[in-house]
């Protein structure tokens, strides 16, 4: 009898105040994470875009040659993977093509610039030489940075249909196609909002 009353109360709370039930669920989940937390040594290194780096390289976004040099430096340590959680959605403003478009140059200067390798091309080459992954974000609205990108990883499933339990985005936001085609993988940084602003799960 007691169990039935508790169950009835929970059902009414679920209907009348679903946010309360979710809050209790979040608290329980967080408590379990603290009780059963596993201590692990992390070998992850974060390269932060902070005030010091902005003072050295100038305002963001930086020239893509800066990122090419960063990759060169990182590759000396033979990392297992290099992930970028920023987007490179537009051409580098300091690329030869963009300079030619922006300024009224004499033909000889135009010819000289056209023979130069652009920052995006250099960055793409360095990405190809590295174990690099670039971020992709799921979106519900179309973006100029969208094209018919395909996943680089293979997906295997067993049992039911996983698409019935995963959140699907109609569009995606990422980087220039030239850059994405030269990385080893595309990593999703999509997340679903929760009531308290804490990320506990990620949509596949």
Question: Predicted segment positions?
Answer:
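Non-transmembrane functional regions of envelope-associated proteins
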Residues: 3-204
